Amino acid sequence: MLRILPLGGLGEVGMNCMALEQRGDAILVDCGVTFDDRGLGVDVVHPDFSPLDRLGAHVRAVIITHGHEDHIGALPYLLKRHDVPIYGPPYALGLVRSRLEEHEVLAHARLIETAPGRVFEVGSFTIEPIRVTHSIADATAIAITTDVGTVVHTGDFKLDPTPPDGEHFDAARFSKLGDDGVTLLMSDSTNVDVEGATGSESDVGEAIERLVASAPGAVIVAMFASNIHRLRLLGEIAKRQRRKIVLLGRGVGTHAKVARETGYLPWPDDIVLPDELARERVRKELLLVVTGSQGEDRAALARLARADHPSFEVAPGDRVIMSARTIPGNEPDVYAIQGQLMRRGVEVITARTERGVHVSGHAHRPDQRKMIELTRPKCFVPVHGTIHHLTRHAELAREMGVASVAVTENGRVVEVSRDDDRARVMLGETIGAGRVHVWGGQPIAPSVLKMREWMAEQGVAFCVITYGAGGVPDVLLETRGVMDDERGPKDLEAAVHEVREALAGAQEHATDEDRAELARQAIRRSFKHSRMMRPVTVVKVRR
């Protein structure tokens, strides 16, 4: 029997990480992060790896399908807990090296390059990477030979008929696997609701070049930093249109550096202009590639919109091309930045105003259907998506005649069994899955996050109670984030009065801790009455 335990990526978008276990051996497929958008000082969120201990297996390795952060970003945190080798395609490992170096764990890491068609063994598993197309270079699916037969994990994919790097989706290999028999297919569910062709990266290049050629000033392209295919096309466009590429933003600089080092970005040496020289060039000679397509406040696009970027300032006649999908939930921030740019006389182009400036890297429903047709699996488990995406993808598999289909979420085991030529998937035990929030490289306790959230919603009150020689307490009370209006002094005075009343009623033998608690309750009670708020309240008693 094969057991599959998703630690992340099922029931959500991002943080992809899945364990496969048989005979006491386990491998992880991908190890990614997600982000917390609540504004609580969280850098990244990664899977809780403790369920691996409860799985009762020895983790032999991590197999990386491609280099997106939601597939590799948690590796530094995993390696601090499990000393395991990491297998992955060259470009992904280039990004992994950069990430591990930042966390000072590269020296002890074992990174092993994979290649499509090159089979290798990890414990009781045999693994074959297969070329797929995606919005990042060097993306692969994996075929895993297990005790129950062949398991195919697609990773992130789409069917791009004209990939910019010439690395085509290997439909023939998937078809051959289908001929030989696939027990289980686990397939990318992200765009299951989208009908129609997914679109090719090469088509994006044509649309953007038309906009660059007609622009009277500088052109700024905001995109996901990891889309090396698009970055490659922009370099070719810049050369033909006699412009220089300027990279603004740490992410795009890192990806360009790794891509050039690994041969995936064949730019001529003179195509890139250092950002500190951008102000010296004629605007029509510049093609800037910037981070911040999702409205991130500290990213390059937001800084350009605020006119506080040290290297460049936008001006009337410039053109911004939003060459990225806006992730649901980010719309207010993205629209606010676009508005700031427009107030500066900048033309803003989006996929809504100009078709073709962006295509998705994830398979639309027809591509998902094609993957099932090629592999003809006996069993199916949808991966990578919310419960809505997973359920819709499962429905598609059933429509196409897949005999055994299971929908699971993070922490719920799927058991795969096979008897002669019959195979089935069943939901097994719930081992559990959690999330670890990280700030400054260190985990943040859930209690700390809860307190931060409470402070953000309700504010903070600070109270110092000083007992002098006469025994009558002096009460000093200040607040932050509770009030700032004409009623403020009156409400503050009322809260101080409540504290004094509470202290006056304290029993004679009450400790300072007892008095502090009486004061805390009085403050919260007073502000609940006057402000409908219960601020986090800190009380100190001094004598």
Regions inferred by a protein language model and the residue ranges of each:
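His/Asp/Glu-rich metal-coordinating catalytic cores
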Residues: M1-I63, H68-E280, A299-E313, P332-Y335
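A glycine- and charged-residue-rich anion-binding loop/surface
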Residues: L10, T34-R38, V45, H58-V59, ...
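Short glycine-rich phosphate-binding loop at a beta-alpha junction
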Residues: P85, V381, T537-V541
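C-terminal tails and terminal domains of large nucleic-acid-associated
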Residues: D512-R543
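Extended hydrophobic secondary-structure segments that form protein cores and membrane-embedded regions
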Residues: E113-T114, V289, V538-R542
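Conserved hydrophobic residues forming the short capping helix/wall of the S-adenosyl-L-methionine
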Residues: L100, A397, F527
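Hard-cation-handling environments
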Residues: D193-G329, D333-T353, V357, A363-T511, ...
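Broad gene-expression machinery/nucleic-acid interaction feature
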Residues: C17, S124, A139-A141, E285, ...
